[in-house]
């Protein structure tokens, strides 16, 4: 059973007194994304200044396209690393009541290759499905949504297998994940009214809630035999409770 209300309630308790580092992570990721977009902003400004000068604008457009291609590759790398570092950080947060430092988040950067390949692979498949129709692209995005959690918890599993495992544990629950996303929509609107200030509370709350959903989906899939512990391989030994997690997985019980 998918109990989004329970995952959200647990998330609130897990974050009590521990918001400092998640907020710092938000500030860091926002700054990084702004920095990698600076070249695009500069090129757009130059085109605007060129006004109606056709050749200058065409030259600027060609330059902008070249910059965009390079930035896209850089963005895949950076966003992939950020995604897997986020996933690992919130898995740690979900398994211990201790306050976590920014260093816990930085440790996730060691999984940079898994993050980059995961982002590239996921984008490719979501894009291909979206070429058919928009809705299948959304459905597949939710099917692949657990991939970064799996890669963060089981770094040796491999990107392609992590995607297949994500599809397996979300089978029959993609609609639930979609509804869970919608349940935050009202808060997102309110955040817009506060010029994004509310995001400092909302984003960690969402991240923690979806991490709890991941644990539940994985535990349910193990319990029903949809997947096995061997499918995932060893858990990252540096994660809190890794030994206990391995034992529970072998028994097919909830983590």
Q: PLM ranges: what are they?
A:
Residues 1-255:
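Hydrophobic alpha-helical membrane segments
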């Amino acid at each position: 059973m998918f109990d989004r209300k329970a995952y959200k309630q647990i998330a609130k308790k897990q974050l009590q007194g521990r918001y400092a580092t998640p907020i710092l992570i938000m500030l860091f990721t926002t700054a990084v994304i702004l920095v990698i977009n600076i070249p695009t902003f500069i090129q757009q400004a130059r085109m605007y200044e060129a006004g109606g000068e056709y050749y200058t604008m065409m030259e600027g457009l060609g330059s902008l396209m070249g910059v965009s291609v390079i930035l896209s590759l850089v963005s895949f790398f950076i966003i992939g690393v950020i995604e897997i570092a986020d996933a690992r950080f919130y898995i740690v947060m979900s398994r211990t009541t201790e306050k976590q430092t920014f260093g816990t988040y930085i440790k996730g950067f060691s999984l940079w290759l898994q993050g980059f390949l995961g982002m590239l692979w996921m984008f490719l498949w979501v894009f291909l499905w979206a070429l058919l129709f928009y809705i299948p692209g959304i459905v597949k995005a939710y099917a692949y949504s657990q991939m970064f959690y799996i890669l963060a918890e089981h770094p040796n599993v491999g990107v392609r297998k992590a995607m297949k495992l994500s599809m397996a544990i979300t089978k029959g629950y993609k609609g639930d994940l979609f509804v869970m996303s919608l349940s935050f929509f009202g808060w997102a609107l309110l955040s817009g009214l506060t010029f994004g200030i509310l995001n400092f509370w909302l984003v960690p709350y969402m991240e923690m809630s979806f991490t709890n959903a991941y644990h539940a989906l994985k535990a349910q899939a193990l319990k029903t035999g949809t997947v096995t512990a061997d499918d995932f391989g060893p858990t990252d030994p540096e994660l809190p409770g890794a030994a206990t997690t391995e034992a529970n997985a072998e028994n097919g019980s909830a983590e």
